[in-house]
Amino acid sequence: MKSPALQPLSMAGLQLMTPASSPMGPFFGLPWQQEAIHDNIYTPRKYQVELLEAALDHNTIVCLNTGSGKTFIAVLLTKELSYQIRGDFNRNGKRTVFLVNSANQVAQQVSAVRTHSDLKVGEYSNLEVSASWTKEKWNQEFTKHQVLIMTCYVALNVLKNGYLSLSDINLLVFDECHLAILDHPYREIMKLCENCPSCPRILGLTASILNGKCDPEELEEKIQKLEKILKSNAETATDLVVLDRYTSQPCEIVVDCGPFTDRSGLYERLLMELEEALNFINDCNISVHSKERDSTLISKQILSDCRAVLVVLGPWCADKVAGMMVRELQKHIKHEQEELHRKFLLFTDTFLRKIHALCEEHFSPASLDLKFVTPKVIKLLEILRKYKPYERQQFESVEWYNNRNQDNYVSWSDSEDDEEDEEIEEKEKPETNFPSPFTNILCGIIFVERRYTAVVLNRLIKEAGKQDPELAYISSNFITGHGIGKNQPRNKQMEAEFRKQEEVLRKFRAHETNLLIATSIVEEGVDIPKCNLVVRFDLPTEYRSYVQSKGRARAPISNYVMLADTDKIKSFEEDLKTYKAIEKILRNKCSKSVDTGEADTEPVVDDDDVFPPYVLRPEDGPRVTINTAIGHVNRYCARLPSDPFTHLAPKCRTRELPDGTFYSTLYLPINSPLRASIVGPPMSCIRLAERVVALICCEKLHKIGELDDHLMPVGKETVKYEEELDLHDEEETSVPGRPGSTKRRQCYPKAIPECLRESYPRPGQPCYLYVIGMVLTTPLPDELNFRRRKLYPPEDTTRCFGILTAKPIPQIPHFPVYTRSGEVTISIELKKSGFTLSLQMLELITRLHQYIFSHILRLEKPALEFKPTDADSAYCVLPLNVVNDSSTLDIDFKFMEDIEKSEARIGIPSTKYSKETPFVFKLEDYQDAVIIPRYRNFDQPHRFYVADVYTDLTPLSKFPSPEYETFAEYYKTKYNLDLTNLNQPLLDVDHTSSRLNLLTPRHLNQKGKALPLSSAEKRKAKWESLQNKQILVPELCAIHPIPASLWRKAVCLPSILYRLHCLLTAEELRAQTASDAGVGVRSLPVDFRYPNLDFGWKKSIDSKSFISIANSSSAENENYCKHSTIVVPENAAHQGANRTSPLENHDQMSVNCRTLFSESPGKLQIEVSTDLTAINGLSYNKSLANGSYDLANRDFCQGNHLNYYKQEIPVQPTTSYPIQNLYNYENQPKPSDECTLLSNKYLDGNANTSTSDGSPVTAAVPGTTETGEAPPDRTASEQSPSPGYSSRTLGPNPGLILQALTLSNASDGFNLERLEMLGDSFLKHAITTVSLSALILDAHEGRLSYMRSKKVSNCNLYRLGKKKGLPSRMVVSIFDPPVNGLPPGYVVNQDKSNTEKWEKDEMTKDCMLANGKLDDDFEEEEEEEEDLMWRAHKEDADDEDDFLEYDQEHIKFIDNMLMGSGAFVKKISLSPFSATDSAYEWKMPKKSSLGSLPFSSDFEDFDYSSWDAMCYLDPSKAVEEDDFVVGFWNPSEENCGVDTGKQSISYDLHTEQCIADKSIADCVEALLGCYLTSCGERAAQLFLCSLGLKVLPVIKRTDREKAMCPTRENFTSQQKNLSGSRAAASGAGYRASVLKDLEYGCLKIPPRCMFDHPEADRTLRHLISGFENFEKKINYRFKNKAYLLQAFTHASYHYNTITDCYQRLEFLGDAILDYLITKHLYEDPRQHSPGVLTDLRSALVNNTIFASLAVKYDYHKYFKAVSPELFHVIDDFVQFQLEKNEMQGMDSELRRSEEDEEKEEDIEVPKAMGDIFESLAGAIYMDSGMSLETVWQVYYPMMRPLIEKFSANVPRSPVRELLEMEPEITKFSPAERTYDGKVRVTVEVVGKGKFKGVGRSYRIAKSAAARRALRSLKANQPQVPNS
């Protein structure tokens, strides 16, 4: 706008355009509408970018205000033209020359070019040295380097001597080119150019074309002269010209304030006094030595400041400032040592007090009297009054107010898909010092010259506001440049000052204050909102200060007011004319200069006449007209995805045609799908041409679907590929909670495997008999055998249990249970089939079946009824034995009949002994017996195993406790029992176990870590003493008919049947997937059995484990590697039907398994200390083996998979070898005789090494012998694994599938977490690849990202999983037979079970007691107390030996916890015997949390680790809230909200389970991981397709045959190879089942990656010149270079017209790297736990690491972007990396070491660097034909050092570490803004301090703060040595 008011105005005529008075209504131009989208002009681009465009186009002189932009322009120009200088110098290659004025500037330029490009740079600064060089020497230099940076003198010498001719230079850069006007080498160099035919491109850089005052004519002349000398056009940057043509110019007003009339004479008097005092000090004749400080300095300063305030603001302010200065002086006086200095200070102090006294005579300082202020101040207040907002504008206001700070805040998240970034509470509380939300219409700055003026003026305005209601709306503050300067050294005091200033700016930005009084520092560099009022209180003295203060008035309607005293006004008018002239000159030079006047003169065009609008629907539809089109285009560009540094804008070029008309060409940013430039028709003027082309553009954008039907940009949500998502409709349920979240839980029936449904045998129908084989494979190690008990291997006795059913049971893997004797391996083998039984037999069997569950195991309870015919799962469990001396097992009918007859079967037999018929002791009766004391507990008698017969004790022996003399006396006194036989021996007994959950070892927690135990000595002493044993008298006990050996096996039944159930369910799922997805076979070959189920960790190690290797002559060598502590060739003992072990010539029925370990011939015994870490099942001793071993490069044994060594591998027999040879670490192939496998190569097609755990990988421990034949004496029913099978062809091991179905809450030995993480990353990869490659060629990254997150969302996966029927199959709660076990043949009795239905809310993770630990503990105590009355102290009561020893506190703590949190509504009676009273009610507190538990006072000493299951850090929660919750199995966990008041679900524990939606989604991912590890990537993709996630293209049946995917061929051919006719049949069935109507093809690589473009190839060559060096560096050559270019092209790089920008490749690469790294970590032989995996993955897959690696491998030198901010951030980051030169972990401690610890500044990590690291991975993937291997070959070498460093020492994010360390007392503040636009976060660790962190986003700042807190906490911790 032309300034309407340049003439001085008297106040009456002062017409300010204030927002309130503006015709557009009061809400136009609100300051918080920050980044307004321009409607009438294209969004301006950064001035550096404009200048670069100009420089590329012609010779240019760049005039900038500061040095900052110069390097950017020079370096980018060099890079853009670098294709001209890469050639060989001797073959017409050119060179780029930088000229600088002085030697010290050379280094600076060199480092800039080296940092940002890979060009070779030569530096020449010393004229003396280089003057002596010969032409040859120079020639070498020119050949070696491509960019030459030299001082002007060196250059002149080189050119003059003809060593280098100008025609060999492609670009000549002059730094500080204004010097060329003088007589300077620059000028001479330019003279040489005059005669040169092909002159180089010239770039002149100058920042000092304007210095101080300057005459416009001179300036113009200077610029013209410079242009002439340098043959260039001068271009100025917009920072020298106010906002060029883009924004409306402010209205400029000069106000004549009139003279000051001093009626009271006070002003004159004060002025005189001050002058005198100043003169006096100046006259003092004090000699000042140069070293010393001037004593008068402070005094002079203070007095002259005071005088200035008086003159500018008047007496009232002078009085105020005098008061402030007195306070300031006091401080100085107190600290001043030197007498003379002190005297001056005291003099000044007195003088200021005098001033104050004078003022007090005239006015009271308390209130403001306007008679005593200058006219300037009065005018200022008048202006401010005009901005007073109107009252009561109610419309919209509050919303406006609330939304106001949207734009002033940083974009919080670094990128769109960072879901984890916390939402920030953005609404700041408005300060209370202004009355209404409308106050903020003013947004103004008053510029003053001196610091004190600012301070006092602020005081004055505040005072005026109190007195004048018109000014009450003002909320002002001042800011002085003190301490803001970037590079000043800062001390504590400055720091505080700095903080204060920052706070002031923050408030101004947030519009909490609306007026800022500032010194000139705010003119430049500080981030301030657009103001609508700028007042120059002191007139600008030079052009720069005029422009910069004016530049602050950027709001659409703004005023720039200059206040002038009458006497100054004349001279200022002159100045102002000068400034205007200078501005005009510079504006003509501005690279976008268009005459600004045009805007006002041009009327609003009636667009329809000129050019018809684009209308969607004729009547009322949205329309784009000529006048609105540009706004639409700007808005569209602003919505394209981009990083925080780049604001994408359209580029419009307008050219004049010969006939005087104009046409425009519009280019959109390169990541818009509309790639072609749009050319508009010729129009009469420039403005119209620009508008018309925008209109055409809108039409095109709408037609390709980029603008929606309201003509607004299409968001990523309204994707036009919705059909791709085919999201199913959300099922209608009444279940509260968001679908897919943890909060939403639903009930599902528990699955029952088909083969066990209704399979109860019927008379006369054929039956199947299965034997439950049990072999003790790992005896309990001594240090865990506290009572020194004898171990009872189950295979020592022949009688065992079997299963009788009417349907066949598929083969399932063997699995372990953990008894008191150690690990027992269970097998289910078919004994006979097709036989029938009579009704009597079946009735007997049925009665015994019920007897086992009701009496032996006591699992019958009122809620359960035995109804074998109605039960869902019904089959019989019955005893088997060797019948009639034959060696085969059969049903033991005789035994069953004996039991029926026995008196002791149910109750206690009433035997009477008397003196006449005394009790006779027979030893053999007690050798394998269970006994029942006959004198107590008649309703539920206790049962004991006889552990030992003490023949040396009799009832007359001494009783262990002093109260009784002898045992006989004790029984007489206590029970009144007389013994008839006084020399019978006594019995040492053990409880029969009531722990029925034997799935995991007693002494390990679920992660396989040993629980803490009390010291062995203590324990040993305890068990040695008689006091702690239970001693019974045989005469007083009855013998139970069930022998102890069988009883011990019966105790295992619930666990065995439960595991059997689960594995069959998993097997069923495997078969179902085989038919749905075509992965694996529907039914397994009969002779195949999967490897054993295993936990991946193993028992704490036996101190004397032996690693024995069988002698090579041993008949049996079916060795397998099993995850056991003992690496043994477990000779065929374990494959036998009844696990018989034909060892050499032994023929006995049962060989004690231990003989295998210690007596095999030729054994190698290695003592192994207990400190073993089970790696992959091959235990190694840390002292023997330094390092970790990578066995055959794969963890092949996850899951106890018997790894059969197939015959394809020849192994040399060797008998002994040092243990180091067991492992092969660095993957070097060993000599062939020590066969180890190399990964990734399939061996002969059949023996597949799997990609990772889950399938038998054939790997042999060197030294095991391998003969392929089955040993001759193996019976037919034993299985020999046949060579053709592997999980790859048959489908995953059911054990692994079970792992994928088991949640961590089930507290089993395995859970789905590791698999889930692998599946999660593969899923992301699969979805990404398909969305990019096959289907969507033109969607940009934001949309792709949105689609991906929709598909992989928990909500979607949950629906798919539910459709697939997973919830019923999942294992969600801990197995606890008394609580949730349903024995076979039982049904839940609906009437009685109501008492048992648990309200879901009360359900504590399916009840902790379930652990089977607590009830035991209680039961034990109760009993022992009875029997061992002689104990001295009750505290010693110790529970059953397999229970850990908890001291009373633990138990009390747990009680408190359970009772306090009302853990169970249904009380499980603490003694499992009183099965009747199962309905106590414990009520539940509303919300159980740590706070509300009534802990015992000694809670602090409670050792968490020992109660592993009870209190645990629950990582699953951390994901969601970033907070760790110490989870007590508290009810609110399992519920959908007691607190939320939603309905509770009640459900039956035996037949139903309650699962959170998210767990189902996790399970889907884990199953995917399971298929991926077992059957490979193709299988995993097919599995996803079968779920309904289309990750492969569908082929119609017809063309199926032609396009069979090679991988599918493999599947099928492998099927064909199955040996034998059966296999062929199953192969055929397989094909039939697979080839349904759908076939899936393979993903194709998208056909094009370059756009059709006439010059495409040439452009490509130019753009990637020099990239061959990069290809060498990463060791990969691109076949299609366009991918390479695309990977490095940033969205701002508009010179690339032939490919897309890197965003889509980055989206792909991100998923690929995430998957490859996760897979690598998953397969690490160290078998990281889920928590560690998560930490490692987030430490390695993050932007910081990727960016650091990108810089390390020079990615940044090839990066193509045109973005000044990004340029500087990368520059900083690279410098920082060079200094640090050491990569760090998580968040990589990227901070500059600042001495002042006050705030921690995290260095900015440029996201773009991490992005190109990812995009290159995507490019290699595409270029190599979608080969993940290729990508990993390139990336693994780069990442390996980090992977190894972190795996050895897992980093955690500082925020998480802090929250884990101090979860209760850590509080993070919301974000605050700092003065330069960054974010500050404060973390308070209550009681330990507050710590601040600063960064560009909330997340960075938060982690910086957390890191400082951690450093401080760790420093103050007492150092505890790591135990």
From Swiss-Prot:
Q: Which residues form the RNase III domain?
A: 1276-1404, 1667-1825
Q: What subcellular locations does the record give? A: Cytoplasm
Q: Where is the Helicase ATP-binding domain?
A: 51-227
Q: Which cofactor does it need?
A: Mg(2+); Mn(2+)
Report which gene this protein is encoded by.
DICER1
Residue ranges of the region described as Required for interaction with PRKRA and TARBP2? 256-595
Q: Where is this site: Important for activity?
A: 1807
Residues recorded with modification Phosphoserine? 413, 415, 1015, 1160, 1461, 1469, 1471, 1869
* Protein's recorded name: Endoribonuclease Dicer
Start and end residues of each DRBM domain: 1853-1915
Domain PAZ stretches: 894-1041
Q: Tell me the organism's taxonomic lineage.
A: Eukaryota, Metazoa, Chordata, Craniata, Vertebrata
**Motif mapping: DECH box:** 175-178
